[in-house]
Amino acid sequence: MNTSNKSYDPITDIIFTKGLKIKSATHKDRKLDIILNNDLILVVSLKNYKKLNGAPLEEVNNFKIIGNGTGLHWPTLDEDLSLYGFLKEFFKQNIEKKRKLVIA
């Protein structure tokens, strides 16, 4: 019998077993290109994030990588977003859109 109160989280598992971290990020056309240390690129629309969507471009461009590559921080907007959250949203959107997900 398992007496642990911990539950398995596949997103956390992927991040830690693969050692995923944010290597860099760029902003263009109201989207963030988030480059991971395995060269995977996540394209994130700012419309999904209230503080970023309505912010002036100068403030959107003022961010830094935090937590040893686990997130992004916008000091002037008081906004923090995580790699975990980006991946969670990616999986959620792809499942909701009923896209073909290939397991190879």
Show which residues each predicted segment covers.
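Motif-centric detector for short Cys/His coordination patterns
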Residues: 1-104
